[in-house]
Amino acid sequence: LDKKVFDSAIHSFVLAFIAEEEYTNYMNNTQKEIETTGKVIKNMYFDEIINIKKGYISVNDTIFEDESSLTQYLLFGPNNKIEKYVVKEGDTIDSISEANKLNYKEFLVANPKYSSRDSLLTIGDNVNITLINPMLTFVYDVNEILDTEIPYEKKVEYDSSKASDFNEITTAGVTGITRIDENYTVKNGQTQGGVEIVSSVKIKEKVD
């Protein structure tokens, strides 16, 4: 196995589970610091220990000579036959995923040209509907600060001096906002082990 082929395949494997911009910014140490909200990757690694060494192998063993075949092996395993589907009118990523017992995230991993579940499909395109079976576990740890809304409650007051079908808004409700600082781990594109809440601060009170 050529080391350049291996390095390229590992790179393609990684980009199946993380946006290229996020990966590049982490590797180049050019992530933007969080000022109000946002996220940064704190650590990135493989669960497995990968050893590269010279040696002799049997002529009956599989030898990966190009990036594509090795990437396919790393993503789908040794015995997975690649299955394709031809996009028809009305198809969406969600509908194709559901029909083939995939979740949309697995579809996106198998078809990295599509960036989100809302990406438009072109009629006649061949898409990969093979269930992934990764041979490696790509892990990264994230610190994220985000704002979540606190919905206000509607309060109804009755006025006996008004008609029964009369209504008016006396005080407009205001949605509150809580700023949450959290840590979590992502393995092969899936958040694992729950979320650790570092802090939770109300920055805007709700008004019912």
Which residue stretches match the model-derived regions?
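Extracytoplasmic
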Residues: L1, E35, Y45-D47, N51-K54, ...
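Cell-surface/extracellular proteins and modules involved
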Residues: V5-M27, T92-E106, S115-R117
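Extracellular LysM carbohydrate-binding repeats and other cell-envelope/extracellular binding modules
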Residues: Y26-G77, N103-F138
